[in-house]
């Protein structure tokens, strides 16, 4: 199998073919996802909650991300692998470059960073130094203390700010964008305004791709279950069938449905 590249996702956007992506944190699940045909995976700082048991993503370190990136890369040698730069790992452009080097050496193809126009110089610096960047707007979990919790973003006037941020990140060189917990109407505007692929989570079925935290897709998240999550394992009965169902529902636009979306 040939390695999946960003140009393949670009082609999906142009051809209006929706694609499914998922978080992965270890060799075994990465291999399972790759075997079933998921070609894009994220080593998310969500591992702070799903793997380490913290109540936020803030305790996650660059070393944690690198460790899990190495494991996932072994399981899915040909996937397009995104890795998060965690909280305070990109406070300055120089710091972002140093930490991006660590996760890229561990096997990432691209780094994901949270934030808007303030990141323009960082995105430019990374891109100029051959580090592909995925932006992340909307509900950015590293900012949980600023937002005062996990809430829908981009309603009202904030929608235009988010769209401007998205355009600024693209102009700076970002090649992908994750849009989290925003109204469907805004997600549609952003997806249509950008030439780069947009991956949604809690952004309706109007984005180019979808991502889910694997624990949400399998219904093994304890406590609060996000509105946008769907337990594919409950319906499918086994993990491989659940992954197949997730992919099929994303590609057909069935998932996320109205019941998983915000307005």
Curated annotation (Swiss-Prot):
Mg(2+) binds at residues 45, 84, 114. Binds 1 Mg(2+) ion per subunit. GO terms for biological process: pantothenate biosynthetic process. It is found in: Cytoplasm. This is 3-methyl-2-oxobutanoate hydroxymethyltransferase. It is an enzyme of class 2 (transferase). The keyword Magnesium applies. One of its GO terms (cellular component) is cytoplasm. Pathway: Cofactor biosynthesis; (R)-pantothenate biosynthesis; (R)-pantoate from 3-methyl-2-oxobutanoate: step 1/2. Keywords: Cytoplasm, Magnesium, Metal-binding, Pantothenate biosynthesis, Transferase. One of its GO terms (molecular function) is 3-methyl-2-oxobutanoate hydroxymethyltransferase activity. Belongs to the PanB family. Homodecamer; pentamer of dimers. SUPFAM superfamilies: Phosphoenolpyruvate/pyruvate domain. HAMAP family: PanB (MF_00156). Its EC number is 2.1.2.11. The active site is at residue 180. Its cofactor is Mg(2+). It comes from the Bacteria. It catalyses: 3-methyl-2-oxobutanoate + (6R)-5,10-methylene-5,6,7,8-tetrahydrofolate + H2O = 2-dehydropantoate + (6S)-5,6,7,8-tetrahydrofolate. Pfam families: Pantoate_transf.
């Amino acid at each position: 199998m040939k390695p999946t590249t960003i140009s393949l996702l670009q082609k999906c956007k142009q051809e209006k073919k929706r694609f499914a992506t998922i978080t992965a944190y270890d060799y075994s699940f990465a291999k399972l996802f790759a075997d079933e045909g998921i070609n894009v995976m994220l080593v998310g700082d969500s591992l702070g909650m799903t793997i380490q048991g913290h109540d936020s993503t803030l305790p996650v370190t660059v070393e944690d991300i690198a460790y899990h990136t190495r494991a996932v890369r072994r399981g899915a040698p040909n996937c397009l692998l995104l890795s998060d730069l965690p909280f305070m790992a990109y406070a300055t452009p120089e710091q972002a470059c140093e930490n991006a080097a660590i996760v890229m050496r561990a096997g990432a193809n691209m780094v994901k960073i949270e934030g808007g126009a303030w990141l323009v110089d960082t995105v430019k610096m990374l891109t100029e130094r051959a580090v592909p960047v995925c932006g992340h707007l909307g509900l950015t979990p590293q900012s949980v203390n600023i937002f005062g919790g996990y809430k829908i973003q981009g309603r009202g006037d904030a929608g235009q700010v988010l769209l401007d941020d998205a355009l600024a990140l693209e102009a700076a060189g970002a090649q992908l964008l994750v849009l989290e917990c925003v109204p469907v109407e805004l997600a549609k505007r952003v997806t249509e305004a950008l030439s780069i692929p947009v991956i949604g989570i809690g952004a309706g079925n109007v984005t180019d791709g979808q991502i889910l935290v694997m624990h949400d897709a399998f219904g093994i998240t304890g406590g609060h279950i996000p509105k946008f999550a769907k337990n594919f394992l409950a319906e499918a009965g086994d993990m491989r069938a659940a992954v197949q169902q997730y992919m099929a529902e994303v590609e057909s636009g069935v998932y996320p449905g109205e019941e998983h979306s915000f307005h």
